[in-house]
């Protein structure tokens, strides 16, 4: 019966949940169909609204999460009413979870489509996606809101090919008294120079990220994706704006569009309204040109799911035969030996909001598309601790995770020869590096490899020092707010 219901068109369009629906238990209003993946702060499920038959996405967020950030995300979505921004329908509290009901985009994110097809987008396809995305950004910026995490993984497509901005977990609101923000937040490779430098930024920070996203859609990954993100953090503000790896492959209009986005000075960078008038965007074709790549991606995903299901069924048969063989005097040990059964899951842990992933895709990839197999994979979506943690930039969370991985990988290994002596770690006076000439190539390579963990450790120490100064101020502000509320 459920399949028939899904094939029928919605009886009427769901615009917002009414008061009667919001007073009921969510299970009375929705049928949860399947888990789609993990987004910022919670798990995302596909569900059907019983009254209208409309498919929706439901983000289930543990109450132990950072409620302030979640409320901010809801607040921003609630204020938005644009066909180019994912719609918000309402929220429920259920046991220890907050259920956030949102618009469902069946084709997934642009980065999902690239990975599923193993193919980047053409210029025509990119222009169409950018046109809708710019309309969404124009709307947000008119509302004085900054998305702060624009990338291919946060641009969702519905099955008709309409692009919508999603995942407002790190979005910010600009007020009249706060012309620029100073918070470092976003994904390293997509971040604007002024965001990294913490010199204050406004809505055009999203335009820089959009330029990086245009390169990502064309080449499969953002600039600097091949290097350590810590180095990228230092290179983005100091190096000239990035360009295509092979500029000769792209038209002058597309190249100029990216150039207009990637202007280092925010004051001279184009706005969303201005870029909508750019020849590359104005000549964009209709959304119908995206339907073929959407259908191709969905077919690939369906075939992979069918293949995985066959493997699961085959494993079940093999295990059943083993059970019959073990029914004699031999008793089967229960424990680690049970690892032959595979879980029938089609979603990775690293999926973004309302984005369906196939479990054969790289896990925890976020949105950065890597064309070669031996490169590192990054993203913004990280699992968060259930306990409350001080806010920190997402790229620092990434560095901490990498540091833990490095420590695990290096456990039991000896320290490289020239690095055993603590004096070798000191910064030479007056930049005198003559002593390096006496080292072997192997020793120099070991020292180079050791620099990144050192840098990350120093950054973490600075962050902790800053947090120790910041937290008492935040506590004092919160205490004053509580006293004002009591009055």
Swiss-Prot record:
Q: Could you tell me which residues belong to the region Disordered?
A: 303-332
Any one Pfam family match given in the protein's UniProt record, by short name: Pkinase
Task: Give the regulation of activity.
Answer: Inhibited by the C-terminal non-catalytic region. Activated by caspase-cleavage. Full activation also requires homodimerization and autophosphorylation of Thr-183. Activated by RASSF1 which acts by preventing its dephosphorylation.
Annotated active site:
149
Q: Which Gene3D superfamilies match?
A: 1.10.287.4270, p53-like tetramerisation domain, Transferase(Phosphotransferase) domain 1
Q: Which UniProt keywords apply?
A: Acetylation, Apoptosis, ATP-binding, Coiled coil, Cytoplasm, Kinase, Magnesium, Metal-binding, Nucleotide-binding, Nucleus, Phosphoprotein, Serine/threonine-protein kinase, Transferase
Gene Ontology cellular component list: cytoplasm; nucleus
| Cited SUPFAM superfamilies | Protein kinase-like (PK-like)
Q: What is its EC number?
A: 2.7.11.1
| EC top class named in words | transferase
Per the record, residues carrying Phosphoserine are: 265, 320, 410, 414
User: Domain of life here?
Assistant: Eukaryota
Biased composition annotated in UniProt, kind: Acidic residues: 313-326
Q: Which GO terms describe its molecular function?
A: ATP binding; metal ion binding; protein serine kinase activity; protein serine/threonine kinase activity
In the record, Phosphothreonine modifications are located at 3, 183, 340, 367, 387
Q: What does this protein do?
A: Stress-activated, pro-apoptotic kinase which, following caspase-cleavage, enters the nucleus and induces chromatin condensation followed by internucleosomal DNA fragmentation. Key component of the Hippo signaling pathway which plays a pivotal role in organ size control and tumor suppression by restricting proliferation and promoting apoptosis.
Name listed for the protein in its UniProt record: Serine/threonine-protein kinase 4
Organism, scientific name = Colobus guereza
Give the taxonomic lineage as stored in the record.
Eukaryota, Metazoa, Chordata, Craniata, Vertebrata
């Amino acid at each position: 019966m459920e399949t028939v219901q899904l094939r029928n068109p919605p009886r009427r369009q769901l615009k917002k949940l009414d008061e009667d629906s919001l007073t009921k238990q969510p299970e009375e209003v929705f049928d949860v169909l399947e888990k789609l993946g993990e987004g910022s702060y919670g798990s995302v499920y596909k569900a059907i609204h019983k009254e209208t038959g409309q498919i929706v996405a439901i983000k289930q967020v543990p109450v132990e999460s950072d409620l302030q950030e979640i409320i901010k995300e809801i607040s921003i979505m609630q204020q938005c009413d644009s066909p180019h921004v994912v719609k918000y329908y309402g929220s429920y509290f259920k046991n220890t979870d907050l259920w956030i009901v949102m618009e469902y985009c069946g084709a997934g994110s642009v980065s999902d489509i690239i990975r599923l097809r193993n193919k980047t987008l053409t210029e025509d396809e990119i222009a169409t996606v950018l046109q809708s995305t710019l309309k969404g950004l124009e709307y947000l910026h008119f509302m004085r809101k900054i998305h702060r995490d624009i990338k291919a993984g946060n641009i969702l497509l519905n099955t008709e090919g309409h692009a919508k901005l999603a995942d407002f977990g790190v979005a910010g609101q600009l007020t009249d008294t706060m012309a620029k923000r100073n918070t470092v937040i976003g994904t390293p490779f997509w971040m604007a120079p002024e965001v990294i430098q913490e010199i204050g930024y406004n809505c055009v920070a999203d335009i820089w990220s959009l330029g990086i996203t245009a390169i990502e859609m064309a080449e499969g990954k953002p600039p600097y994706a091949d290097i350590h993100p810590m180095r990228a953090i230092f290179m983005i503000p100091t190096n000239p704006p990035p360009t295509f790896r092979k500029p000769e492959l792209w038209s002058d209009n597309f190249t100029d569009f990216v150039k207009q986005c990637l202007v280092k000075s925010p004051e001279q960078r184009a706005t969303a309204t201005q870029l909508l008038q750019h020849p590359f965007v104005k000549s964009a074709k209709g959304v119908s040109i995206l339907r073929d790549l959407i259908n191709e991606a969905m077919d690939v995903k369906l075939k992979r799911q069918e293949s995985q299901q066959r493997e699961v069924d085959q494993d079940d048969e093999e295990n059943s035969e083993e059970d019959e063989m073990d029914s004699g005097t031999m008793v089967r040990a229960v424990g680690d030996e049970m690892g032959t059964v595979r879980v029938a899951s089609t979603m990775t842990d690293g999926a973004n909001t309302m984005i369906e992933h196939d479990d054969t895709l790289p896990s925890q990839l976020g949105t950065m598309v890597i064309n070669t197999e031996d490169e590192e994979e990054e993203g913004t979506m990280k699992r968060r601790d259930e306990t409350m943690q001080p806010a920190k930039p997402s790229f620092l969370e990434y560095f901490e995770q990498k540091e833990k991985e490095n420590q695990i990988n290096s456990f039991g290994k000896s320290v490289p020869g020239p690095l055993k002596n603590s004096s070798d770690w000191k910064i030479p006076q007056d930049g005198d590096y003559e002593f390096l000439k006496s080292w072997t190539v192997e020793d120099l390579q070991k020292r180079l490899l050791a620099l990144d963990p050192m840098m990350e450790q120093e950054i973490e120490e600075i962050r902790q020092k800053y947090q120790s100064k910041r937290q008492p101020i935040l506590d004092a502000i919160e205490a004053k707010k509580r006293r004002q509320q009591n009055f």
